[in-house]
């Protein structure tokens, strides 16, 4: 349950005035209160414990109550660099929707082991464009979740204080572009890499065998069934079938057919039910951005990739064509002829050491900001 304050219902008759007094964008405040009851006021950018105290009678009462609870972009929670397993992601999402009540959250599916796969959404009521971002398709690429959640908190907080980043107005982006974000596509696999097979119960022996009895699971990319989720999509899947492992493995097995795994099915349905205009999938490693697929990508991809390169400080390099099929982005471009980008974060051997996080984040954040922008 999101945290709200109890106010005199009449105060909400003029949300524009409330927004002005609290120095919150009016559309942002309206978005935060779309589902609020008449006595509830949700205030983005504040840390509010569930409030069931006395009814606040005036805007001045509200301001006095909120003042010591206001967050800033420099707050440690916004700036933190954190490793996330599945339970940490759930806790973070709970706080995000509490502090930023204009963010909605829903379960789009469940993993093999029954863990929820969450989608976060943020965007103005009249936003025309749609962007989707995701992280941790591959288990040992868990650092992508850390990058995406840190950036999303930065984006949400910048909306509350209307602080521009990379020359972009966050409020303009919010009002024009609806963002869909899945921070942890492969929760079982990420937990296996970070926490080991001890937490996997009856499947421990099977997982040790699929991992070829290595001392750890650092090379594990697949889901818990030993299927590579990013080789599961119906776009020339047969090519991957004939050249990749033919049985479950710690990496690269594309499954016995496309879309056999609950995680890939959830992502497939998410896109088919509401196709975005642009898609970004975060992976590691190589400091490259794959943007083409069989010549089916739209013309604007070539221009956008140049801006991505510049905003990364020319650390990332665009690569139009690679020898890869049946990926999430591949399928998206193949079937929708829209922009799709695989951003390969960092350099080194997966899982990348977390000491790289600051460098990776600094090179990536501008790309994520630019991804929300569309030329009129």
Curated annotation (Swiss-Prot):
Query: What keywords are assigned to this protein?
Result: Hydrolase, Metalloprotease, Protease, Zinc
**Sequence positions that bind Zn(2+):** 138, 141, 283
- The residue ranges of the Peptidase M14 domain are 82-372
What does the similarity note say?
Belongs to the peptidase M14 family.
Listed under GO biological process in this entry are: proteolysis
Q: Which InterPro entries match?
A: ENP1_M14_CPD, Peptidase_M14
Gene3D superfamilies, A to Z = Zn peptidases
Record-annotated disulphide pairs: none
Q: What is this protein called?
A: Uncharacterized protein YqgT
UniProt keyword Zinc present = yes
Swiss-Prot/TrEMBL cofactor(s): Zn(2+)
Asked whether the UniProt record includes Thylakoid among its keywords, one would answer no
CDD domains reported for this sequence = M14_Endopeptidase_I
The UniProt transmembrane annotation reads: none
Q: Where is the active site?
A: 344
- Gene name in the database record: yqgT
Q: Which GO terms describe its cellular component?
A: extracellular space
SUPFAM superfamilies in the cross-refs = Zn-dependent exopeptidases (SSF53187)
